[in-house]
Amino acid sequence: DPAPALSAPCSEPCPETCSAPAAETAELAEETSLTTAVMPESPVMADSLTHGQRVAAIAATLFQDLAELHGLDDVWGHRLHLAAQLHDIGFAEGRKGHHKISMRLIEEDLSLNIHEDDRPWVALLARYHRKAWPSRRHARFDALKKSDRKALRKAASLLRIADALDYTHTGVVGNLAVAVKKRKVIIAVQCSGDCSAEMERVIKKGDLFMHVFGRELECVCQGN
């Protein structure tokens, strides 16, 4: 299958049809305020903040381009955006198990400007950005009604792919486009350098996506 055509970079606010993962200045200001509320001043946390912004932009593109496939509404798009921003705040207490720490911080830190209706969902999404899939062996996930479990799995699968596309935290992946085929989803990315680590990671972390949507996942780099 041919790779989908990449969108040109936006030099001004992007229309709805543009797939370039660029955030508006005002949005970045709001997002920075959100994350710095819990992030101590350190190189590690500064990197996590920048990485979170990139992952949020990529996740927004995936959410938009895959809308017909996932069928989630804008409420879930907003939750995904917040979770992408905050998924690595657990690094504030160390790398080991940081996904679970991120969940706890999102749940407990009321300085984060998250609506209380969204907070538990954002926390769960951050928890499932890595390691174990959402599972009914987990009490919090099991307590959800079936439709909510299904929606959370879908959103978590997108977050894991978005995170993988900035695996090296270098911003090597720029614009991307998604094509949905009958048995396959193709993600075409524009890379500014070697993105082999990202390509490999997408397939590894895309296992939940392939399970949830029953489609093979392919990621191709089209260069600059």
Language model region names:
Residues 22-24:
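C-terminal helical "lid" subdomain and adjoining coupling/linker elements of P-loop NTPases
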Residues 38-45, 51, 56-178:
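Divalent metal-dependent catalytic cores for phosphoryl transfer on phosphate-bearing substrates
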Residues 49, 93-96, 196-203:
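Ordered, soluble secondary-structure elements with a strong preference for glycine-centered loop motifs
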Residues 159, 165-219:
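Low-complexity, glycine/alanine/valine/leucine- and proline-rich hydrophobic stretches
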